[in-house]
């Protein structure tokens, strides 16, 4: 007991954090078991509660912007939030830097590191100062005015950041602090994943437990509790898988409505990462006999293909052109060892010439 008290005096910040997280864990666990045993719940409802509870815990345990590339997702959601709030006309300065609130400058240019010449991202290297700042932070913003960030947004479909941007917008309307802003964005991202994941669990005729288990992976929980657009990608991927299996095993014939739903998911998902376009090859699992007309099957394949290719080219035309015809400043993966600068990428010529490297 004496050792515990001495540790408390030496590391009060750490112990306050442990007590805070323990109380939250107990409260969430009590609420979960109350709903689980007091009323009969479907697996989809249990899934929704589990994702919201565990995701919220991960969001509190892992410091904001500590997830992979979260600072880039933060800037992308911030830019979309500004457009939602009607600030699109004055979004960037002359150098293309995003306009943000003065309150939010500490997010990607933290001054607590004692290195004014470096733009340290808050949460990238967690230390006691950052934990203390989060503990002492108020709900409302303390600074007024505007500044700019040097971080650049991710070029992808704005749909990927709609829910984090919605959270940012609510926080900015309430004049919330930078921590309020970040946690609102994280919460709305988690909420989106939990809702679509629950729909996927509800619809899929088989493999419900597999989808549930994948969602419980630590990496999955880290991503869905952050600002990452991987929460959006995973949610749509789960929903797509559930629809493909449902279409294959349902008794009713498939029609135009089912094709339209798959096309909408393809339009929303394919521009995010080109590799996810291959996921739609699973559509061939659905037999043409499941359709009301064989012609409708081929029309559906053509429509889904267009729904993948057109948004993909529209959003990722620059990246695709670098792959087909590399630029002068491109650094190929096979030549990158021992070199600095340039833009690392893959291209058709390199892959065909040295497939063992890739």
Question: Model-predicted segments: where are they?
Answer:
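Membrane-interface alpha helices of multi-pass inner-membrane proteins
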Residues: 9-10, 222, 258-274, 279-285
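Start-transfer (signal-anchor) and selected internal transmembrane alpha helices
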Residues: 10-56, 296-304
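Transmembrane-helix motifs of polytopic, lipid-linked glycan transferases
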Residues: 28-35, 180-206
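Transmembrane-helix signature of polytopic, membrane-embedded enzymes
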Residues: 41-45, 176-179, 198-218
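Interfacial juxtamembrane loops and adjacent helix segments
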Residues: 84-183, 333
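Specific aromatic-rich, kink-prone transmembrane helix
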Residues: 199, 234-250, 262-265
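Short acidic/glycine- and proline-prone juxtamembrane loop motifs at membrane-interface regions
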Residues: 226-233
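Membrane-lumen/periplasm interface segments of specific transmembrane helices
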Residues: 282-358
